[in-house]
Curated annotation (Swiss-Prot):
Binds 2 heme b groups non-covalently. It is found in: Mitochondrion inner membrane. It is a multi-pass membrane protein. The cytochrome bc1 complex contains 11 subunits: 3 respiratory subunits (MT-CYB, CYC1 and UQCRFS1), 2 core proteins (UQCRC1 and UQCRC2) and 6 low-molecular weight proteins (UQCRH/QCR6, UQCRB/QCR7, UQCRQ/QCR8, UQCR10/QCR9, UQCR11/QCR10 and a cleavage product of UQCRFS1). This cytochrome bc1 complex then forms a dimer. Its cofactor is heme b. It holds the Pfam family Cytochrome_B. The keyword Transmembrane helix applies. Heme b b562 binds at residues 83, 182. GO terms for biological process: mitochondrial electron transport, ubiquinol to cytochrome c. Component of the ubiquinol-cytochrome c reductase complex (complex III or cytochrome b-c1 complex) that is part of the mitochondrial respiratory chain. The b-c1 complex mediates electron transfer from ubiquinol to cytochrome c. Contributes to the generation of a proton gradient across the mitochondrial membrane that is then used for ATP synthesis. This is Cytochrome b. A ubiquinone binds at residue 201. It comes from Carollia perspicillata. GO terms for cellular component: mitochondrial inner membrane; respiratory chain complex III.
């Protein structure tokens, strides 16, 4: 008798995706982040669902409803901080996942890569709208500053901003629609994840060497299921530690002050995971130029496959490219630090230099280095 997992119409899909899926035998822990992102999404949807049961999306009561969740709801504080810090964990896994893709040349699977970029934008939009919901000072002013950037679009900019706001400033209508979209988008993300996996399973996984591994495959279960479960435990332990010992470590104290349109905080900044893009935005004195640089800092990932001129897929055997990759990582850390600093000397010039270097490494230095490495190979 054939096993039910191979014959049942629904279980057959699960079986071919998670049980009998052929996977390269050499996958390292860097390949854990896809499944970790799935766990993060599940945690966010579950905690978000329970938070939405107690939250009210009205400017008069939003801040108090979050306080009520933390003080009066059974384990409401755990839900709230799991959700807030779960977002940080989500972005840590996202950035490591993208970094792994860049390092090992996974971007040559262009469909999977492009769906991944769409996912990145969707998660960023979701996180931004979620940050507005507690209706603290940083929520209000962050929403005002970031949505206002759209006014830089020629001709339709101002109308577009007012259309998003639902009025002439960030107010009740804005908060209500942001809550609606914040609730909806994670399910769009979940659907995109299915599409991402569909494309990935068409080609199969890449591996650290970048060499086709069709001749050396092992079943996903039990080898990689066990490996993934270890990843889950490590990540959930880190998340629990953060939530239980230092839940406000990554937050902004200004968000414990209710939103006040008449009082601007001294330093308006987004959550830490957007600081690198915010630093690039601020480093250009022109408003439209800054907005374009902000969008391009993420969208640049879409042209990375076109800039791949190396004869080797992975950076595993390309020491010069490795040096550039880690320089890029250092530049991103620098930008994240600068994004959280006030706009004054010497932070301005450091931010501008780091921004130029960011684009220079990806657009010019990496392709040139690949050409040099190709020449070295043929010697």
């Amino acid at each position: 008798m054939t096993n039910i997992r191979k014959t049942h119409p629904l279980l057959k899909i699960v079986n071919s995706s998670f049980v009998d899926l052929p996977a390269p035998s050499s996958l390292s822990s860097w390949w854990n982040f896809g499944s970790l992102l799935g766990v993060c999404l599940a945690v966010q949807i579950l905690t978000g669902l329970f938070l939405a049961m107690h939250y009210t999306s009205d400017t008069a009561t939003a801040f108090n409803s979050v306080t009520h969740i933390c003080r009066d709801v059974n384990y409401g504080w755990v839900l709230r901080y799991l959700h807030a810090n779960g977002a940080s964990m989500f972005f840590i896994c996202l950035y490591l996942h993208v970094g792994r893709g860049l390092y090992y040349g996974s971007y040559t699977y262009s469909e999977t890569w492009n769906v991944g970029i769409l996912l990145l934008f969707a998660v960023m939009a979701t996180a931004f709208m979620g940050y507005v919901l507690p209706w603290g000072q940083m929520s209000f002013w962050g929403a005002t500053v970031i949505t206002n950037l759209l006014s830089a679009i020629p001709y339709i900019g101002t109308d577009l901003v007012q259309w998003i706001w639902g009025g002439f400033s960030v107010d009740k209508a804005t908060l209500t629609r942001f809550f609606a979209f914040h609730f909806l988008l994670p399910f769009v993300v979940a659907a995109l994840v299915m599409v991402d996996l569909l494309f990935l399973h068409e080609t199969g996984s890449n591996n650290p060497t970048g060499i086709p591994s069709d001749s050396d495959m092992i079943p996903f279960h039990p080898y990689y299921t066990i490996k993934d479960i270890l990843g889950f435990l490590v990540m959930l332990t880190a998340l629990s530690t953060l939530v239980l010992f230092s839940p406000d470590l990554l937050g902004d104290p200004d968000n414990y002050t209710p939103a006040n349109p008449l009082s601007t905080p001294p330093h308006i900044k987004p959550e830490w995971y957007f600081l690198f893009a915010y630093a690039i935005l601020r480093s250009i004195p022109n408003k439209l130029g800054g907005v374009l640089a902000l969008v391009l800092s993420i969208l640049i990932l879409a042209i990375v496959p076109m800039l791949h001129v190396s004869k080797q897929r992975s950076m595993m055997f390309r020491p010069l490219s490795q040096c550039l990759f880690w320089l890029l990582v250092a530049v991103l850390f620098t930008l994240t630090w600068i994004g959280g600093q006030p706009v004054e000397h010497p932070y301005i010039i450091i931010g501008q230099m780091a921004s130029v270097l960011y684009f220079l490494i990806i657009l010019v230095l990496m392709p040139l280095t690949s050409i040099v490495e190709n020449r070295l190979l043929s010697w």
